[in-house]
Amino acid sequence: MSDSIDTHNEADISVISYMLDAVRHGASTVHILSDDTDVFVIMVYWCWKAGITTNLQMEKWNGTVLSINATAKNLGDHCCSILAMHALSGCDTTSYPVGKGKVSAIKAMRVVPGKLLHCIGEAEATDLQITKATRTFFLTLYNQSNSVTLDAARYDIYRKRKRPPALKTLPPTERNMYLYGRRAHLQVLLWKAADQADPPAVDVTLFGWEKKMGLKEGEELIMPTQDSSPVALPALLDVVSCGCRAGLKPRTSAKCSCAAAGLACTSYCSCKGNDGICCNILTQQQEHKESDEGSGEDDDRTDEDSEDEEAAFC
């Protein structure tokens, strides 16, 4: 095994580098023990990309052995888009769209026209190509292919619901989609460099990340760039927000403009929808409903997302 290939900062990529090295040295079987979906997806991609016939297996901690070769064969040419799909729908370094799991993401990948997703992770890809690919993927994922932008899709979804949907269930805004697409592009760029001795030298601040000083002296943190633009038109926020706020005598629900409109209060209201301040009974009902549905971060996943995410690819 070559010692010179393990120069990547990510352990997942190092695992793939050693896998490729083992294949080059004539290994008949490469058996990797991992519970990481990222590792599984990257293995499938490289099995297809490099045309590997060596028996590739990934064993999960529960003893389940997954055939990488069979998965790559099942996906066929869609393997070319699998890294982009995985990064856009949530991986170790990117967040995931609430309520949209890998089953939905794979269906969207199969529907996205032609080779549109292929540009993600390619060094020569332009901002325009990455943005178009990311937008198309999310519009497809949310069944909003008739919309031109994600902002329009958000409005359309909100308008068609009988009750206001939780904001976290809406597609990202156009600006956040752009930043998110850049972060996904960078991650796929690194995954696609697993066969190289060194990872590509990049400035992460050009890919939806920003550097900030940590609490410790000399500590530098890399954080996702946050967009400060409004999530909806100011006029719309004025319509669906109330003026109830802390420091004033609590208003009755009947006097709350949101309650009068049949809406729960949100963070855009003066009361911020805060349980200790908000008097809107609809807000309280929504909070209780969300609490009953589950409070953990993983509970935002849909029923299609079992613990065995890899099964969605097979």
What are the roles of these predicted feature ranges?
Residues 1-98, 102-314:
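Noncatalytic, typically N-terminal accessory segments of nucleic acid-processing enzymes
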